[in-house]
């Protein structure tokens, strides 16, 4: 399903680049994903096989035509035709990742022992931007067991500068001696 969602997201991304733009399409597919997350009845209506595709498409047209770009509404209708509407939330996530990559942005998970003030957050973002060569968008998580320092996860790479890790390294060295 992830590969299928990625393929649909790539198609939507190309469509967005040719028409109204990445912002408009990103907001539109994000609105749909948020609606599916927030409204279980709408999600069930759209995803259940018991309701005819024609009825689903009629509701989508009524709700979204005039609110979203025509090509985006047509894209949603195609997902219904292909019985892939349950992937719309995944498609939205993949689309956002494609936009971030295209714009040179990287979402980075930063784990710290205590909350960071705004000045420190800005400093971390600037240093990560320099390190990654992309605009870093840090998502800070507070976990007291880190003890101090920070752990940074950027994609598949982890930079562990935590006090806990340094203490574990010292412990291993002492045990070897």
PLM region spans:
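Elongated, mostly alpha-helical coiled-coil "stalk/stator" tethers of large membrane protein machines
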Residues: 1-177
């Amino acid at each position: 399903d992830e590969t299928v969602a990625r393929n649909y997201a790539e198609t939507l991304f190309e469509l967005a680049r040719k028409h109204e733009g990445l912002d408009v399409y990103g907001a539109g597919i994000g609105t749909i994903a948020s609606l599916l997350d927030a409204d279980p009845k709408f999600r069930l209506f759209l995803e259940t096989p018991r309701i005819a595709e024609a009825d689903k498409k009629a509701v989508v047209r009524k709700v979204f035509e005039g609110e979203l770009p025509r090509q985006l509404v047509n894209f949603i209708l195609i997902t219904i035709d292909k019985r892939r509407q349950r992937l719309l939330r995944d498609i939205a996530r993949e689309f956002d990742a494609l936009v971030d990559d295209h714009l040179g942005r990287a979402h980075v998970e930063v784990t710290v022992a205590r909350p960071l003030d705004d000045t420190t957050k800005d400093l971390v973002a600037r240093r990560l931007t320099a390190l990654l060569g992309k605009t870093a968008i840090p998502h800070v998580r507070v976990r007291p067991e880190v003890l101090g320092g920070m752990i940074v996860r950027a994609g598949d790479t982890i930079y562990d500068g935590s006090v806990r890790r340094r203490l574990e390294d010292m412990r291993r060295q002492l045990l070897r001696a």
